[in-house]
């Protein structure tokens, strides 16, 4: 029987985070967004029209998601991410975590290699659904193929366009090596999470691994609309090669789709009428300006030794302040000034001893433009006296 993904109960608050919500003035966690950027007027108008004009949407829909939405997604992914698929290969679900739970059923008995550091929720979902995870330390090009071979895994979960949380982009030669690894033995598959691929500010993103391998290659492509629309808008999708698609359709034939049909059709109309592409373009420009403003404010108010990594893409970057006395001291000092962020070591599955010292992960997608100077000033007050090179 197919298994649902299960998210574990919240852990006790780590020592280097703040539990009192009232103390937080500036949330630099990576899951935050600026809700004022949500296209509420156009989205609401479409949804209202559907509510009154499409009563059939109250009925159960296609198990994979409504076909016209899947066609829009396939066209969008083909144009912007080079994904090679038809609408039939697209599966819509309520978040990547749910879709990973479905994949865990399809890959029962497998072992997954995961990036270290990496996205801890992915590891939790896979392991809670019976897929052991083996951490593989990334390098400057992403997940190393030799270490992947040594792991003994037949699945490989990667974020090649924008590694979370370091921001590393996997170059074309490493991508080709990864695809060769998957093709070398039957039963090997790559789970490609195209995290944050819409937000690349310096250069165009490389084509997806799925597009490089072809429609029936050994790659499952996953993406979400959480960052481009809102985290509370639980719409994600995966693209399955034909062999896996047939198993999915057989094993999940009795399952209803987990996304409201009104939400599906609203997104479909939003994409079909060009709203989505324009919204992404506006978001990309807005976040690029905020990234540049935040980086400039940090450099102006902090030690000149402060370094920023990963700012070229995604909605967060790594801040390293040599001689600060460790990431825990940095996180705690920031919390006293009302700023929430996490240390880099929190994203390690193991071997955090290899973690870059004095480094924290700072997301800026939840900051409004007018809050950037104050947030940077708060970090300046927190960290100015911590570095070995005081200004």
How should each PLM-predicted stretch be described?
Residues 116-125, 153, 189-190, 200, ...:
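A generic "structured core" feature
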Residues 47-187, 198, 202-215, 220, ...:
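Conserved core of the PLP fold type I
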Residues 1-48, 253-260, 268-271, 281-286, ...:
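N-terminal basic, amphipathic alpha-helical segments
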Residues 191-196, 303:
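Conserved acidic functional residues
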Residues 33, 161-164, 227:
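Short glycine-rich anion-binding loops that position phosphate/pyrophosphate groups of nucleotides
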Residues 217-285:
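Conserved core segment of the aminotransferase class I/II
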């Amino acid at each position: 029987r197919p298994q649902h993904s299960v998210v574990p109960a919240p852990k006790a608050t780590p020592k280097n985070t703040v539990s009192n919500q009232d103390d937080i003035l500036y949330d630099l966690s990576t899951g935050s967004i600026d809700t004022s950027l949500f296209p509420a007027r156009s989205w609401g108008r479409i949804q209202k029209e559907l509510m009154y004009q499409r009563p059939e949407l109250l009925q159960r829909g296609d198990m994979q998601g409504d076909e016209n939405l899947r066609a829009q997604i396939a066209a969008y992914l083909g144009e912007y991410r080079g994904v090679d698929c038809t609408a039939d290969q697209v599966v819509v679900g309520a978040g990547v975590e749910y879709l990973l739970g479905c994949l865990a059923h399809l890959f029962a008995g497998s072992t997954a290699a995961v990036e270290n550091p990496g996205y801890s929720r992915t590891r939790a979902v896979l392991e809670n659904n019976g897929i052991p995870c083996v951490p593989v330390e990334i390098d400057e090009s992403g997940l190393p193929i030799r270490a992947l071979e040594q792991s003994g895994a037949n699945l490989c979960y990667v974020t090649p366009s924008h590694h979370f949380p370091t921001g590393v982009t996997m170059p074309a030669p490493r991508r080709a090596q990864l695809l060769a690894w998957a093709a070398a033995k039957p039963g090997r598959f790559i789970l490609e999470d195209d995290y944050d691929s819409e937000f690349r500010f310096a250069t165009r993103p490389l084509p997806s691994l799925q597009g490089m391998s072809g429609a029936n290659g050994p790659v499952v492509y996953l993406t979400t609309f959480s960052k481009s629309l809102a985290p509370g808008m639980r719409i994600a999708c995966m693209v399955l090669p034909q062999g896996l698609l047939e198993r999915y359709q057989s094993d999940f034939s009795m399952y209803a789709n987990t996304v409201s049909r009104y939400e599906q059709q609203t997104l479909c109309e939003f994409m079909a009428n060009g709203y989505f592409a324009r919204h992404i373009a506006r978001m990309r420009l807005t976040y690029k300006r905020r990234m540049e403003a935040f980086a400039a404010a940090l450099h102006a108010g902090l030690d000149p030794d402060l370094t920023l990594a990963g700012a070229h893409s995604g909605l967060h970057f790594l801040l390293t302040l040599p001689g600060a006395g460790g990431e825990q001291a940095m996180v705690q000092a920031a919390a006293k000034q009302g700023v929430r962020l996490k240390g880099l070591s929190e994203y390690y599955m193991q071997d955090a001893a290899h973690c870059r010292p004095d480094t924290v992960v700072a997301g800026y997608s939840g900051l409004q433009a007018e809050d950037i100077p104050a947030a940077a000033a708060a970090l300046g007050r927190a960290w100015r006296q911590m570095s070995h090179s005081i200004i």
